[in-house]
Curated annotation (Swiss-Prot):
GO CC list: cytoplasm
Assembly information from the UniProt record: Monomer.
Name of the gene: argS
MF (Gene Ontology): arginine-tRNA ligase activity; ATP binding
Reactions accelerated catalytically: tRNA(Arg) + L-arginine + ATP = L-arginyl-tRNA(Arg) + AMP + diphosphate
Short motif ('HIGH' region): ranges: 132-142
Keywords: Aminoacyl-tRNA synthetase, ATP-binding, Cytoplasm, Ligase, Nucleotide-binding, Protein biosynthesis
PROSITE patterns, alphabetized: AA_TRNA_LIGASE_I
Name recorded for this polypeptide: Arginine--tRNA ligase
Family stated for the protein in its record: Belongs to the class-I aminoacyl-tRNA synthetase family.
Biological process terms in GO annotation: arginyl-tRNA aminoacylation
Length: 556
């Protein structure tokens, strides 16, 4: 626990003690202490509505209760300088700030671990994201989903959850079939044989390249092979190539998955039949008009859903149910799916399936990622100027860089539309939020290099109590918020809170820098304390940016 959390804990304990001392309620009657940080700091560092909460039990006016609580509150134990009562009975606490200086060594000693909390208590969480069809390039929607998903995973891990990142490979549908036929056609053509491309085939240069490589490596072996054997070969080779391309792009984007799960494996391992058997046993499916239906309306869906069509083929929902059953059987406590906006209507039927399988519907959470609109030179950019097609993740990385993409995609709530200004993303100005945050880190590193030249990095005693100016206190308070921000953002699945925090910390640092001469050769004792403060800022900013997947440069 960090110093700020300890102080909040002490205030809560002293509020409870004051309730008992004033005989306003018994221990069993005391409600949970709500302690908030007012946005307007003239209302104190912390505020509680305990007086209003106790009104019914104590049978007194909240204002009177507040006065009794204040009279019985031990300020010294909780590092409180003064207490004020506001409005109908809010109690505002003003810290004496002595606790803040303890934060500096706490943060510096914690290093990369600063900000870690045990909020998740080791809960096993699986996050499935991106999961694009492996037959083409990743586009902007996939890129935003990748950035948000990976940031959420980093955030959950920081908050004490046991996180697994998973990519679901849609390798059982017509698209993979067409890929196999396209590879076959290009292979045959490379051998000089006549073979038409399939109607919905893939005509890109990369598939032509695959065909040529196969011809060079295997000659006409697969042109003469058994049809089934050769088809499987084309399918596997094409899929392997496309997946390798996806993985390369995602790794360049700093996104790595723990598990790549194949849809085809659900068929091969009998998982679909098993899931259907469970639903049948629980009387969750029925036959009608030659088809097999799922009673999803039982669980709030707007209509029942077909699982097996009258021609014997499965609908998309059937392997999805089997896949989610497989996830749950692997022992995850929570499943988080990150889907595109076009999947919004799919949520009720998947939640219904989770319930029909015997699990709580809240086991499944779905985060929706809205569309991205690119802007360049103040105008909407619909297509790539280079290719005339939709802009890809790879192309945008080359245009604006990974840092800008990761930060911009993660700085808004995923369920809100995102306008991505390419000119802003590459500008070296304070208007560019990623540049602003990274520049703050580089500025701190520059100060630390100056401190080393002054001999401040030699160790020895540090008088942290000298760090008391208004701007220093603001900076310390902002540093102290980080673990609570991590915990709250993780619990509420709001990764954009971390980009907000990084920006706020950068702003607080810049404000401090502009107001104070940070290092002063004529006052080395104060400079030593401020040098350590800068180390704490560097650590915290690095840790925040790391969650977002953004680098922290030492020079800019």
């Amino acid at each position: 626990m960090n110093s700020l959390e300890q102080v909040k804990g002490l205030i809560k304990e002293e509020i409870q003690a004051a309730v008992l001392k004033a005989e306003l309620a018994t221990e069993e009657q005391i409600p949970n202490v709500v302690l908030e940080s007012p946005k307007d700091k003239t209302n104190g560092d912390f505020s509680t509505n305990m007086a209003m909460q106790l009104a019914r039990v104590a049978k007194k006016a909240p204002r009177m209760i507040a006065e009794e609580l204040v009279a019985n509150f031990d300020k010294a134990k909780a590092s409180i300088e003064k207490i004020e009562i506001a409005g109908p009975g809010f109690i505002n606490f003003y810290m004496d700030n002595s606790y803040l200086t303890d934060l500096i060594p706490t943060i510096v000693n914690a290093g990369e671990a600063y900000g870690e909390t045990n909020t998740g208590k080791g809960e096993k969480v699986q996050v499935e994201f991106v999961s694009a069809n492996p037959t083409g390039d990743l586009h902007l929607g996939h890129a935003r989903g990748a950035a948000v998903g990976d940031t959420l995973c980093n955030l959950l891990a920081k908050a004490g959850y046991d996180v697994s990142r998973e990519y679901y490979i849609n390798d059982a549908g017509n698209q993979i079939h067409n890929l196999a036929l396209s590879v076959e056609a290009r292979y045959m053509q490379a051998l000089g044989l006549e073979k038409e491309m399939p109607e919905d085939g893939y005509h890109g240069a990369d598939i032509i390249g695959i065909g040529k490589r196969l011809a060079e490596e295997f000659g006409d072996r697969y042109a003469k092979a058994d049809e089934k054997e050769s088809y499987e070969f084309y399918r596997e080779y094409g899929l392997k190539y496309e997946l390798a391309k996806l993985q390369k792009d995602l790794e360049s984007f700093r996104v790595k998955f723990d598990v790549w799960f194949s849809e085809t494996s659900l068929y091969k391992n009998g998982k679909i039949d098993q899931a259907l058997a469970v639903l049948k046993e629980r009387d969750e499916i029925f036959e009608e008009d030659g088809a097999t239906w799922f009673r999803s309306m039982t669980y709030g869906d707007d209509k029942n859903r077909v699982l097996i069509k009258n021609d014997g083929s499965y609908t998309y929902l059937t392997p999805d149910i089997a896949y989610h059953r497989d996830k749950l059987e692997r022992g995850f406590d929570k499943l988080i799916n990150i889907w595109g906006a076009d999947h919004h209507g799919y949520i009720p039927r998947m939640k219904a399936a989770i319930q029909a399988l015997g699990y709580d519907k809240e086991t499944l959470e779905v985060e929706i990622i809205q569309m991205v609109q690119l802007y360049q030179n103040g105008e909407k950019m619909k297509m790539s100027k280079r290719t005339g097609k939709a802009v890809t993740l790879r192309e945008l990385m080359e245009e604006v860089g990974v840092d800008a993409m990761r930060y911009f995609f993660a700085m808004r709530s995923g369920d809100s539309h995102l306008d991505f200004d390419m000119d802003l993303a590459v500008s070296k100005s304070n208007e560019n939020p990623v540049y602003y945050a990274q520049y703050a880190h580089a500025r701190v590193c520059s100060i630390l290099r100056q401190g080393e030249e002054l001999g401040l990095a030699t160790g020895g005693d540090v008088n942290y109590k000298l760090v008391t100016s208004e701007k220093e206190v603001e900076l310390l308070k902002k540093l102290g918020e980080f673990p609570a921000v991590v915990a709250d953002a993780a619990q509420k699945r709001l990764p954009h809170r971390i980009t907000n925090y990084a920006f706020e910390l950068a702003a607080t640092l810049h404000s401090f820098y502009n107001a104070e001469k940070v290092l002063n050769q004529d006052n080395l004792e104060l400079s030593k304390a401020r040098y350590e403060l800068m180390k704490a800022v560097r650590t915290t900013l690095q840790n925040a940016l790391a969650i977002v997947g953004v680098s922290a440069p030492e020079k800019m």
